[in-house]
Amino acid sequence: MPPVRCVIFDCDSTLTRIEGIDFLAGPVREESQRLTEQAMRGLVRLEDIYGRRLALIAPTRDQVAAVGERYLAELVPDAGAVVAALQGEGIQVRILSGGLLPAVLTLARALGVPDWLVGAVNIFFNADGSYAGFDSASPLARSGGKLEMVERWRPALPRPVMMVGDGATDLETRPGVDRMVAFAGVVVRPAVVAGADTVITSTSLAPVLPLALDHELPRAPGARALYEQGAARLAAQSTERPS
């Protein structure tokens, strides 16, 4: 495949090490994590647990803002450098997440990804900042929704397109993208690893750069050290799924 022209990243457990909704959960974290893991492994439909998790947690505006800051504190190694290097090579970077929009936008803005290239689930608050609900009509709050969003984006997507993510909802985009990369550097989900075209087992996102460039050297000299690091990490693992 030639070098890609667009990379779409998942957010939770891909660009950042945490699952934002689980981080919010506090005393109900164990139950929230259980529901999240079931959905990310494809064992239950996302729409069956999305609203349940938020109803359990009832997050306030301030708590959701804190998730955004925590995202930044828990960035996956080299996430920022990889995004900058991709953009420097003229590759469009998008973020597609089932996370909460205000928190995901905090991460995106810190990484230099414009708001219009971000998809996430909006959340609503009362005047006092208490939880008032979420956008239940969002495709990203249901299984298959990420593929639906990729299809909505299609007219504006530079191609080829590569998806990078860890969960079953990311794998569902496979029919709409040119390459699906399973990022297993935070959480390993066997079904996602088995279904992806390529797997990154490194805890760093550096391998995304040589994969996106199809192993061509970056034009920007400043990106070459990151490229070489990523290529070395790929060489140390078996990345291609057996045919």
Question: How should each PLM-predicted stretch be described?
Answer:
Residues 87, 112, 155, 175, ...:
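Anion (oxyanion) recognition and catalysis
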Residues 1-122, 127, 203:
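Alpha-helical substrate-recognition element adjacent to the catalytic core
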Residues 115-147:
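Glycine/Thr-rich beta-alpha phosphate-binding loop at enzyme active sites
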Residues 126-132, 190-199, 209-213:
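Short, charged, surface-exposed secondary-structure boundary motifs
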Residues 97-98, 160-201:
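Acidic, Mg2+-coordinating phosphoryl-transfer loop and its flanking beta/alpha structural elements
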Residues 222-228, 232-243:
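Membrane-embedded alpha-helical bundles of multi-pass transporters
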Residues 134-146, 204-207, 218-229:
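A polyampholytic, Gly/Pro-enriched intrinsically disordered region
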Residues 141-171:
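Conserved Lys-Pro-Asp/Glu-containing loop-to-beta segment of HAD-superfamily phosphomonoesterases
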